[in-house]
Amino acid sequence: NTEISLRTFSPEIVPELQRENALTTEYSKLIASAQIPFEGQVYTVSQLTPLKQDPDDARRAAAWKAEGEWYMQNADKLDSIYDELVKLRDTMGKKLGHKNYIPLGYDRMGRNCYGQEDVERFRAAVVKHIVPLADQVYRRQAERLGKAYPMGYADNALEFRSGNARPCGGPEDILAAGRKFYHELSPETAEFIDVMYDNELLDVLSRKGKAGGGYCTSLGDYHVPFIFANFNGTSGDVEVVTHEAGHAFANYMGRDIVPASCQWPSMESCEVHSMSMEFFAWPWAESFFGGDARKFRYTHLAGALTFIPYGTMVDHFQHIAYEHPELTPAERNAEWARLSAIYMPWMKLEAAQPFYGEGRAWQRQRHIYESPFYYIDYCLAQTVSLEFWAMIQSDPKAAWETYMKYTRPAGTMTFKELIANAGLVSPFGEDALREIASAAG
């Protein structure tokens, strides 16, 4: 890992790195500063999310339209930021001796056991095994909603006519349910969650002007993790307590590993910790969702499956962008629209919603701007987490033991080594995706 990290830097690219940092900060500030007028009030992107899931068709569509209009008003700025980022990164790659940015991008992600050809094989398996299954999910959703298939973004966002699963209670109730879950899951998780809560190592309430997104990091001097997020009253709030805390738990388990650079494994390895923890929380879904627990479980599993094509498309789009840095913004949007037909045939790109209709939806995905090539890590990890889901259904105790085998080595092993150490099926190739499609179908 140190060798890979050393390959990513040269004094020659310092000006580009500085400009890259300025541009990604500009993007983050632009999204965080969003003031979206809706029904006489003003919302941030995060605060608008529950309204984009409203069971009322007209209100939900209007919320999506309001968000899309804000993005369209800032389209030129979003285009210019990304256009400059692509060209900057291409320059960095070439200065470091590469044909384009892609090899440098992989090195910056710390990829130590797989490359572009592995990702291309994974992509092909996703299209073959997961896209048809995800398509069935959305066809059934259209039938439930009484909508024509394919549906637009606003209708795809509503899983049930009665509304999507919502947490019961407010932030304090969700955090209390989280403590209960971790206390009952295992002695290790009980100790971990008490450290997090008792030392206020979470900042999760949404505020105007607060940066968007959610993440977990570590406070190295104190040997503890820290969670940042924005609660918004949706099931995403529970994901903070499961997903981000899954990252935090893994970091807590590896906090004393020396050298400190081995306390975190590579990115895709980390995402297995978080996505799998979401599935370990299933038996406690009633604590989080009350009467909506069954609805949540269905939505969670369906969402895990349908995410894989979307995330793979995000990665494919970035490969095209960096293989062809000369593309204009309009040509990039056309590529997104083309890929949508392959990976997301259930998504209708509506002309009445130009932000989505023109193929601009990728501009909502901050990783594309801030963390190139990160997104495939989510897809690989989701594949492994679905292996855990299948195990949890038959033997939760054995599943947890397998999870701890995967987690304990932290960054002392590569992703492929962690998979083998835990006795899991590698997500590369067709076997894992084929088996998941069979189990979930």
Give the residues covered by each predicted segment.
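C-terminal, non-catalytic "cap/extension" segments appended to globular domains
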Residues: 3, 241, 249, 276, ...
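Active-site recognition of the HExxH zinc-binding catalytic motif
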Residues: 229-253, 271-274, 279, 317, ...
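Auxiliary, metal-adjacent structural segments of Zn-dependent hydrolase domains
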Residues: 144, 161-222, 234-235
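Long, well-ordered alpha-helical segments
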Residues: 82-94, 98-99, 137-141, 246-256, ...
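Long, K/E/R/D-enriched contiguous segments that form extended
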Residues: 144-177, 285, 301, 305-307, ...
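A well-structured
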Residues: 1-164
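Post-HExxH zinc-binding segment in Zn-dependent metallohydrolases
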Residues: 127-129, 254, 265-292, 300-302, ...
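Flexible, glycine/threonine-enriched loop-and-boundary segments that flank and lead into catalytic domains
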Residues: 197-214, 223-227, 345-369
